[in-house]
Amino acid sequence: MDKEIIIGTRGSKLALIYAQKVKDQLIKLANISDEQIKLKKIVTKGDQVQDKRLSEIGGKGLFSKNIEIELLEGNIDVAVHALKDMPANETENLSTYAYLKRNDPREVLITKNNKKISELNSNAIIGTSSYRREFQIKKIRNDLESKLIRGNVDTRIRKLDEGQYDAIMLSYAGLDALSFNSRISQTFSVSEILPSAGQGIIALQCRSDDQEIKTTLNKINDHHTKLRALTERNVLKVLDGDCETAVGVHSVIEEDKITLEAELFSLDGTQRFYEKKSSNILNCEKLGIEVGKILKEKSKDSYKKK
């Protein structure tokens, strides 16, 4: 490819690290020069409003919609997203086409005194921005309190250090990218806390009819990560939830077998519905649909507002 490629990204430190990673992969694997690739910072609504739950300011797509608009208007060629921030259903005329190799999807706890969750005082306040994490914490210790926290990673850590919270929950992948690993007090296994669907995956989106860009992106796509992403997100598509839907999803591929597990909480967090199934990787997308349907049936739509 000889033409210039413009990559659209959020302007946070973490998002720019992810975008630079994409650029580095294109240079290394797609034989594109450094001079050909430009990064364009785009402000999203999720970045602008930092004091409310995402569900209160518009729900799905708050971190991706403005970037997608730039893509549709032809101002950028590739959009870089954290997959977990994207709506389950694809935007018309766009294609989430390639995925970088998945980083560690696990959840971590950061505390001021390096305490584990079992060592926190009763009624300790844990900062989280998602109902999923809030309900999962209650599953481990129902005497802990959850309180909304928003902002980028360094802002959240600063709020913890200032004493606004006793602990905060974050994804390992983000902390690792920002070299904050030393702050981690506890890393939860996937069996302890199921992550968000697609957590730890950088997704690359382009216009559906841009065959030249698709050919280029295919050179940096990680096949197994793509299969896991499609499988996990099919669970979300079937559930058709929103930002308040508390659902954890994770998959693992071993040789030609993919194993998918998912949990769904009722709207108030008092009920938990769980399913785990395996299939041949050739049927991975069907597996996601099947698990989604089972959870939907088990829950009787108790995860949705009436």
Whereabouts are the PLM-identified features?
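Small-molecule-sensing regulatory modules
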Residues: 2-49, 56, 139-306
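Short, well-ordered beta-strand segments
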Residues: 6-8, 40, 79, 97, ...
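Short, structured active-site "lid" loops
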Residues: 51-77
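Short beta-strand and adjacent tight-turn residues that come in two discontinuous sequence segments
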Residues: 63, 81, 169-170
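Short, Asp-centered acidic motifs that coordinate Mg2+ and/or phosphate
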Residues: 76-80, 166-167
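A conserved helix-loop-strand patch within extracytoplasmic ligand-binding domains
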Residues: 83-84, 92-144
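Short glycine-rich anion-binding loops that position phosphate/pyrophosphate groups of nucleotides
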Residues: 83-86, 173-175
